[in-house]
Amino acid sequence: MTSSSPRHADPDENPYVEAPPTDFEPVGALSEDEATEQASLLRAAIREHDHRYYLEADPLIPDETYDRLFTRLQELENEFDLPTQNSPTRRVGGEPLDELATVEHVAPMRSIDNATEADAVREFDGRVRKGLDAEGFDSDAVEYVCEPKFDGLSVEVIYEDGEYVRAATRGDGTAGDDVTEQVRTIRSVPGKLRGDPPSRLAVRGEAYMPRDAFKAYNEALMERGEEPFANPRNAAAGTLRQLDPSVVAERPLDIFFFDVLGWENDAEGDSPNRPATHWEEFDTFDAFGLRRANRVERVDDIEGALDYRDRLMADREDLNFAIDGVVIAVDDRANREALGATARAPRWAFAYKFPPRTATTIVEGITVQVGRTGRLTPVAELDPIDVGGVTVSRATLHNPAEIEALGVNVGDCVRIYRAGDVIPYVPEVVEKRSEGTYVFPETCPICDAPVERDGPLAFCTGGLVCPAQLERAVEHWARRDALDIEGLGPERVQQLREAGLVESLPDLYDLAVDDLAALEGWGETSAENLIAELAATRDPPLDDFLAGLGIPDVGATTARALAAHFGDLDAILDADEDALRAVDDVGPEVAESIRTFLDNAENRVAIDGLRERGVDPESVDVETGDALDGLTFVFTGSLSTTRGEAQAHVEAHGADATSSVSGNTDYLVAGESPGRSKRDDADAEGVPVVDEEEFAGLLAERGVAWPPEE
């Protein structure tokens, strides 16, 4: 059985492909058949839009329209309990896993022999020609395919009947970690193949983090006081090994596919339609909607491959993905089979690697930077050195544990590594010229508060008493995605602190025009403007207030989810970790991070100080209470409200609302056109099924109104 191109992807048949309407009628107005048909149209259209965006770089619709289509599909699937196995909505992540299982590969994922010298590549060519001659092939006809050697994480991805079914890391080459749910969240990995793929297809790809996205993500990590990734490869590898797929979904991973590992057209495993050459396999990738690199070439001799490598190396800084060389592979599959492989590597491929971008220099000093959350980052001050055409005078040492592992100190000769947007760092001490290892300070270099170790990291315990942390906190409060206060950039924040006008976050709201106008570089107009900006933030939306506090792991998206779930600040301040975990986008780690921040006495003083000065966030209209405490509800079908509103309503009164029926469920509330699977689960578990009228009666008995009052 093969999979044909989705019929709904044709713009003539699918209204959501070109100029799609987004003024949808209420979900509750649809029958189950109508919802199923609309969801099918939306899935096909979203896949088409993903293909146009990620593979063709030619989007048909703006991001805002795409988001509306995606949200509508989520609503339909939730309200009507529609199957979502390979729906685009699965990309937002699923339930956290207990561990990564180990799975065997369809075919060995071998490594590739490599070298940085051209002569070694020519020797490889000689072995290929000799081997082909010995097997009776015409070695003069050999052609090579040249492609980038990606510096990411290699994965095997399997499709059956065109549907995505599994993904695994390379592991030891024979078996790897099952990362099916993690890879599913990568937008450029199709959940359903286009065209006419074989009944079973296994492909090899390289998951990576684009360089621009890596830079932005690292900046966000450092802004939150978290350890940045050393390089894009570490970012990709660390992300795919996350047990929580929702964490993976939040990180900007991408993928290139570059090889076919298995191709089966029927139960006997015959493969008459598999391309005869690697070059032709690239055409099938395009036909199936599998993203591949464009910088590939086919050459008829090894000198052409060497020339390709030199040209690609010259352009590497302009690429938005990290590469560390090129792969040169025999094109013809029959030739490949004749050449075979060793236990470790194929005889028909070779990697011509780029020289490393490193240099050696002397550490002239070590300074310690203080981040917004108090994280202390040691930095090596260097004798300036040219590394790959860029003068480097500073390099990160990451954290105290890294210093201890390196054994580095002032005066040592160290190697510096730099690549693209990667922060220059010290991978090794080349020559030890000092005695001992740098001793990390026990007090903050800025405020002298004690330093506290947390695993490999170190933190200043001074909180907002620390001038550095205070300045970063004020800057964060004023950010566009928080309170959006114009006129509070780093230089002005430092000036206000040094003038003694701002010694805590609440002090911002004690500022007066006369105080500001007297400062150097200020005038009455600029002072009045800042005071007006501050006054406009005294009744901020709850989510902006939360985002502005700078709670680790809580950005704008999570702040909105918290605000929508709890409704007011006091409810959030009182919520324990279990209550926090019930919020969309909040997993165990984020819940712990929120609770730790809110339990900090200095942070509570700052929050109370803001409220005392009239900065009190607007509450979201959500009722609270414990009338339903101890009950667990599951909703299915169409109700008089959306399912999300129903869940939020019962949770606001102390109940739990889950997405699936289990032995812990007290009631399955079935609206119109309920999902069959949940009703079957309820029957199997002995869970009572009630309609909306009965549900309203249950709530009324406990003093809770239904539907929720406006």
UniProtKB/Swiss-Prot annotation:
Give one Pfam family, short name only. Answer: DNA_ligase_aden
- Could you say which cofactors this protein requires? Mg(2+); Mn(2+)
PROSITE patterns, alphabetized:
BRCT, DNA_LIGASE_N2
Q: Which InterPro entries match?
A: BRCT_dom, BRCT_dom_sf, DisA/LigA_HHH, DNA_ligase, DNA_ligase_CS, DNAligase_adenylation, DNAligase_N, Hlx-hairpin-Hlx_DNA-bd_motif
Q: Which SMART domains match?
A: BRCT (SM00292), HhH1 (SM00278), LIGANc (SM00532)
Q: Which UniProt keywords apply?
A: DNA damage, DNA repair, DNA replication, Ligase, Magnesium, Manganese, Metal-binding, NAD, Zinc
Q: What is its EC number?
A: 6.5.1.2
User: Where is the stretch described as Disordered?
Assistant: 1-36, 657-689
**Residues that hold Zn(2+) according to the record:** 444, 447, 460, 466
Biological process (GO), any one:
DNA replication
Name the residues annotated as catalytic in the UniProt entry. 149
Which positions does UniProt annotate for NAD(+) binding? 63-67, 111-112, 147, 170, 206, 353
Reaction equation(s) it catalyzes: NAD(+) + (deoxyribonucleotide)n-3'-hydroxyl + 5'-phospho-(deoxyribonucleotide)m = (deoxyribonucleotide)n+m + AMP + beta-nicotinamide D-nucleotide
Molecular function GO labels = DNA binding; DNA ligase (NAD+) activity; metal ion binding
What function is annotated for this protein? DNA ligase that catalyzes the formation of phosphodiester linkages between 5'-phosphoryl and 3'-hydroxyl groups in double-stranded DNA using NAD as a coenzyme and as the energy source for the reaction. It is essential for DNA replication and repair of damaged DNA.
Instruction: Spell out the family assignment given in the record's similarity comment.
Output: Belongs to the NAD-dependent DNA ligase family. LigA subfamily.
Q: Which HAMAP family match?
A: DNA_ligase_A
Protein name as catalogued: DNA ligase
Species name for this entry? Halorubrum lacusprofundi (strain ATCC 49239 / DSM 5036 / JCM 8891 / ACAM 34)
Read off the lineage from the record.
Archaea, Methanobacteriati, Methanobacteriota, Stenosarchaea group, Halobacteria
